[in-house]
Swiss-Prot record:
Species assigned in the record: Chromobacterium violaceum (strain ATCC 12472 / DSM 30191 / JCM 1249 / CCUG 213 / NBRC 12614 / NCIMB 9131 / NCTC 9757 / MK)
GO cellular component: cytosol
Record-given protein name: Probable transcriptional regulatory protein CV_3123
Domain of life: Bacteria
Gene Ontology terms, MF aspect: DNA binding
Pfam families: TACO1_YebC_N, Transcrip_reg
Location of the protein in the cell: Cytoplasm
GO biological process, one term: regulation of DNA-templated transcription
Length: 241
């Protein structure tokens, strides 16, 4: 399957995320805690927890922090009781936006999210207004120059759903959300190391933005991502330089 290049846009957004590393540990700890609460403390039996722990290790989170977060989720240690909630809406030029939160106060969270939408030119919508535009999946990006045929064979053998060749030569391997870690491990065992990858909500159709619209949209996304209760922000917008 062929696709246009997402490489530059992914690098662009990853750079912004890396600039906010001060909040990354807090968000990862919350995700580990909730994952353990929902599916138990054994990462081998809990795909969501395994993803969260793998991500924490990739960010060099100390082992004790990870173990304590799991124990808070399973009730072995006292902790805050977080609730999952999702808010949907529209950004600049009607671009779809979905905001996933973990909070101990939904009243506060919905007010904060609504304020960010309103302040930066978006509109908060009703439940389900844009969720159908996104697919829950995992992806791994391999830099230009990788052996595409060998990667495709290894990826499909490992359980990947699709392999996408982009215009710039980069290759994306698409997986189911709960097969991501297994596919990643299988490819690494065969010498294929991805540049980046994650489980995400991916827009089925993208909204290309440039100029002033791109600037305004980025401000909205930044405002949402900066909220303490927000875990992830997904959008159909592709931000031009």
């Amino acid at each position: 399957m062929a696709g246009h290049s997402k490489w530059a846009n992914i690098q662009h957004r990853k750079g912004r995320q890396d600039a906010k590393r001060g909040k990354i540990f807090t968000r990862l700890i919350k995700e580990i805690t909730v994952a353990a609460k929902m599916g138990g403390g054994d990462a081998n039996m809990n795909p969501r927890l395994r993803l969260a722990v793998d991500k924490a290790k990739a960010e060099s989170m100390p082992k004790d922090n990870i173990e304590n977060a799991i124990k808070r989720g399973t009730g072995q240690l006292d902790g805050v009781d977080y609730v999952e909630c999702r808010y949907e809406g529209y950004g600049i030029a009607g671009a779809a936006v979905m905001v996933d939160c973990l909070t101990d106060n939904k009243t506060r969270t919905v007010a904060d999210v609504r304020h960010a939408f309103s302040k930066y030119g978006g509109n908060m919508g009703t439940d389900g207004c844009v969720a159908f535009q996104f697919k829950h999946c995992g992806y791994l990006v391999f830099a230009p120059g990788v052996d595409e045929d060998a990667l495709m064979e290894a990826a499909l053998e490992a359980g990947a759903e699709d392999v996408v060749s982009n215009d710039d030569g980069s290759i994306e391997v698409i997986t189911g959300p709960y097969e991501f870690s297994d596919v990643k491990d299988a490819l690494e065992a065969k010498g294929f190391k991805s540049e980046m990858g994650e489980v995400t909500m991916r827009a089925e159709n993208e909204t290309e933005l440039s100029g002033d619209d791109a600037v305004r949209m980025q401000k909205l996304l930044d405002a949402l991502e900066d909220l303490d209760d927000v875990q992830d922000v997904y959008t159909s917008a592709v931000i031009g330089e």
